[in-house]
Amino acid sequence: MPETFEVVITAIIVKDNKYLILRRSPEKKRFPGMWTVPGGKLESRDFINTPKETKEYWYNVLEKTLRREVREEAGLEIKDITYVTSLATVHADGALSLVISCLARYDSGDIKLQKEETDKAAWVTLSGAKKYDLIDGIYDELSMANEQLAGKRHEWARA
């Protein structure tokens, strides 16, 4: 088993009290054809070429990565990113991931899917999300985000 984790960050995007979910391409190795929220891996290009002398330096690297991933996968801009929960997991192929889930508000743009990643998109209510074949845990994260929007905060629990 590897000693290091890939770092993944995901966005639970809210717009008009609905959440964006995407269906993963049937060709994806992990969770093909299942519904999830946009996100992706932290890559060295997200920070390594930012000189130390800049105002931002290497701060907010997760937020920058999340904005890049949402832009690439869905064509949208997001704002007001806040932490929801985290998950450490071991995939069937033995790879280790640390997944950091965030709540973000829709800012602008029209959905433009990255076809090699996803093939469908839907804006759903929390109850409507139950009708989709979601990756395990996604509904729970949507529920947590929904509670945060209502002014409640808590640690992860099954919805």
What positions do the PLM features span?
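Acidic, metal-coordinating catalytic segment for phosphate/diphosphate chemistry
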Residues: M1-T10, D16, R24-E27
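Short hydrophobic/aromatic beta-strand or adjacent loop that forms the aromatic wall/cage
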Residues: E6-T10, S97-S101, Y139
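A structural signal for short, well-ordered beta-strand segments
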Residues: A11, Y83, C102-A104
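Conserved Nudix-box catalytic region and its N-terminal flanking loop in Nudix hydrolases
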Residues: K18-R68
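Nudix hydrolase/Nudix homology domain
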Residues: G33-W35, G40, S44-I48, S101, ...
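A short coil-to-beta-strand element that immediately follows conserved catalytic motifs
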Residues: L76-S86
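Active-site-adjacent beta-strand/loop module that shapes the phosphate/pyrophosphate-binding cleft
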Residues: L87-D110, L149
